[in-house]
Amino acid sequence: MYLFYILPFISQFGESKNAIKGKTLNDASISNLLIPLPPLSEQKRIVAKIEELLPLVDRYEAAWTRLEDFNRRFPEDMKKSILQHAIQGKLVEQRPEEGTAQELYEQIQAEKRRLIKEGKIKKEKPLPEITEDEIPFEIPESWMWVRLQQIGELSRGRSQKRPRNDPALFTNGTFPFIQTGDVARANGHIAHWTTMYNQEGVAQSRIWPAGTVCLTIAANIGDVAILDFDACFPDSVVGFNAYRPILSNEFFMYGLMCYKTILDKMSRSTAQKNINIDILSQIAFPLPPLAEQKRIVARLEELLPLCERLK
């Protein structure tokens, strides 16, 4: 056993010049190896000590691997935990003087009726009531569950011409065209773009205003960010605009980040991995009072940069 442990170490110093491509030792180099030879009783003590220490080395290596994995995952896991606390009403305290989500919801419905009457939005088909089976977690009593389409405009991007990458849409372009990769890389706010439409491209698309929440529904499922400028995007991206100033788009952007895993699972149940508007419009979403939405956003914008600094 002494030789079993010592030979791999000693063989490093063998002459491997004549070995096959340097990957193996030849007979001559092995036979010429110099090996330190202690007395037999000492060999046995050396082997015993090695066999005592090697399991500790293995345990240390396993512990180090777990620690490296923990350090690698910790910033993202911490971010997910903070967002989950936010959307469950655990990040900031509830204040009775800020009213209830039910009161806010009634304001939203009044605003929708006004916009419908003015012809600015179309009347939607009634959505089904949210059932207990649809509720993924508990929320504070002052909050309520709603469907996204009940509290804002939810629509797919538009790119009518095929193929979507037709150069005729982009040559000499000057208007931002956002794609799924831009949303994925944005880290919350889309401040840059890589592609631009020309006038023909814009004409066959739709312009979304700055402040729109962008959600990817194909390729990278469930990535979310807010537009910092007016832009077009294709039908692989959904735009959501809560009825402002009654609601905070920033709150819904952070809230939708928590739904990435849920949306990804939903997308796998389809023939092609994507999410459609019908699925999104049915999702149950927690709604806090507006003042609490703003306090949640302010707290998140304090904490999330700290997670980024840990990376």
Kindly give the residue locations of the regions a language model identified.
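Sequence-specific dsDNA recognition surfaces
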Residues: 129-134, 149-168, 181-210, 265
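Short amphipathic coiled-coil heptad-repeat segments
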Residues: 54-102, 113, 302-311
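A short glycine-rich beta-alpha junction/loop motif
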Residues: 1, 10, 19-37, 171, ...
